[in-house]
């Protein structure tokens, strides 16, 4: 029974609450309750993504039919993550660049996925791209998001483009990612801009 709640949170987090199954799941729960629960869980997962023991603990708590507000310190940790994101807004405003069809920015001090929605929203474009160099691997980790007005399947485009440049990638129509060799990042962004008319 609790699995439907976890699935509802996942649908919200993965931008799928408007899809038939996601929409049906969301009708089961109070919308605001589901939204805040999904948000708190997302911030806890993303903020602890390099801590497998904590992630396992979250899974066990959810499997025991606990809601995020029942799990100690989840709201407090989410508040810390929100503060970090609010600081990101000023950095994006200062460092973001725009092209005809997208906004993009290299991220230096946090993860790309945390900034990409701000890049999209603040650029006024239907697509946002944030990328962070992984110096030890000679690649860029790229995060791509599309607005509801984005008319192309970004996951398919990113998959083909990243692969053609010696990397890999893909994902959903409005949310995806890629790994791109460092020397090819500018070409990746330029070509992506051309393909999302």
What are these regions (language model features)?
Residues 1-104, 108, 120-127, 131-134:
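A structured phosphate/pyrophosphate-recognition subdomain
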Residues 21, 103-197:
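Glycine-rich, acidic loop segments that terminate in or are immediately followed by a histidine
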């Amino acid at each position: 029974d609790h699995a439907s709640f976890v699935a509802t949170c996942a649908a919200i987090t993965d931008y799928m609450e408007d899809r038939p199954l996601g929409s049906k799941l969301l009708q089961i729960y109070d919308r605001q309750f589901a939204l805040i629960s999904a948000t708190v869980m997302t911030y806890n997962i993303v903020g602890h993504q390099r801590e497998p023991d904590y992630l396992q603990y979250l899974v066990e708590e959810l499997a025991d039919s606990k809601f995020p507000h029942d799990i100690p310190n989840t709201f407090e940790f989410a508040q810390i993550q929100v503060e970090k994101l609010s600081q990101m807004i000023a950095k994006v405003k200062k460092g973001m660049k725009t092209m005809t069809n997208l906004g993009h920015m290299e991220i230096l001090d946090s993860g790309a996925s945390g900034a990409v929605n701000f890049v999209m929203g603040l650029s006024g474009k239907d697509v946002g791209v944030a990328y962070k160099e992984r110096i030890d691997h000679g690649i860029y980790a790229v995060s791509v998001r599309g607005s509801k007005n984005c008319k192309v399947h970004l996951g398919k485009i990113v998959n083909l483009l990243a692969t053609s440049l010696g990397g890999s990638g893909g994902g959903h129509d409005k949310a995806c990612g890629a790994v791109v060799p460092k020397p090819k990042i500018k070409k990746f962004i330029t070509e992506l801009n051309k393909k999302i008319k």
